[in-house]
């Protein structure tokens, strides 16, 4: 039974680590998208 619990904890740690990495990447993409949108808006407004 102890082996099962240790495997379960390792699986949970892996899942938790993956979830945190996905969350970090989503935050980075969100920031990049906001910056790109802002730069495009400034570029378009500068033409007028």
From Swiss-Prot:
Coiled coil feature spans: none
Keyword entries, A-Z: Cell membrane, Developmental protein, Membrane, Transmembrane, Transmembrane helix
Domain of life, per lineage: Eukaryota
Subcellular location per the Swiss-Prot or TrEMBL entry: Cell membrane
Membrane topology label: Single-pass membrane protein
InterPro entries per record: DVL, DVL_RTFL_regulatory
Major subcellular site: membrane
Region annotation (Required for DVL/RTFL small polypeptide activity) ranges: 13-44
One Gene Ontology cellular component annotation held by this UniProt entry: plasma membrane
GO BP, sorted A to Z: negative regulation of cell population proliferation; shoot system development
Residues passing through the membrane, by range: 7-23
Task of the protein: Small polypeptide acting as a regulatory molecule which coordinates cellular responses required for differentiation, growth and development, probably by restricting polar cell proliferation in lateral organs and coordinating socket cell recruitment and differentiation at trichome sites.
Similarity comment: family membership: Belongs to the DVL/RTFL small polypeptides family.
The protein's name: Small polypeptide DEVIL 22
